[in-house]
């Protein structure tokens, strides 16, 4: 017989976003026993458990931590607040009425009727199948995150001679990690004319170890039938098409793919929340509320982040908003994404989070996060209220691999006669 539970707040995912959201909700008046975290893995912490390198926590804790240390701090806070959680619990669906259906070995099939839901499912890696690389399907082709888990958690070495396709942060970090474990990383090839990772990771993970980064290059063939024996990489033109005659062959037994992250939003679609075509995450308002009232989103399920500190900050915002919603404190509009002020991304800005602002519901200062679509040097981030420019901040360098942000003040959005706020990149 199906088990039924009732909770004020259900959080899908027990990673850094889910934990921070749960803690914030409990610290903002929601009784801990009315919160439930559902995590499909066997432990809390999410992706951080396999990120054993340092560099986490500089913004949140003002000190440098490893991934597991950072996760442990939030896990300890959640446990100190006695927030309930279920491990090994796979969520199957979320209805627009906020009924969560899940299954676990311990509880079997069960449903949770929730007052509010926070989506914190994180993201997944883009696979080889999305790349259409010619060749057989030999052993030795891994996503960078899978290789990271094998090396850091399972104690297995994927290979000894490595080529990496893609220069996302996970790929850069795994170039260093594989080198430290004794492998030879021959090259990191990147399709775009710029790296997809943070500048500090390029320096610390590639430059410091003498690993070459070839921009505007991609893998055009994987050699080997049973096991990878080598790969061919080629330069690409400005339309990202391989250029004949530029082929280079590298003998290797392992190819790691770091070719992008995709927010994990199958449950979001099932709940009826619209997704952004740019981020592949849900469209949200100033409270990080999706198009379905009472369902909120935060972390990498919303848009892919560089820093976990920003994930925690965003998740805390969602936790506070969900607690306020459950307790009846939010001033409801007809629909979460209707009315209000529309945020527009123009002139090199690919998207903004949030997309809609209702000034009556926003905090005193709202952080708007975004990414640019190319490399910009000595340019300006500008914010327009209608046709009036109200912010104009110079940035030495902006790149797609590094998230940017602007701050909007609630006081500036009261009694206004415009219905759009535009975030753009300008030359001067």
Question: What residues fall within each predicted segment?
Answer:
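Beta1-alpha1 glycine-rich phosphate/pyrophosphate-binding loop at the start
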Residues: 9-73, 77, 149, 158-202, ...
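FAD-site-proximal beta/loop scaffold in flavoenzymes
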Residues: 119, 141-151, 254-305
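A conserved FAD-binding loop/helix module that cradles the flavin
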Residues: 298-345
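Short, aromatic- and glycine-rich surface loops/edge beta-strands on solvent-exposed regions
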Residues: 381, 408-428
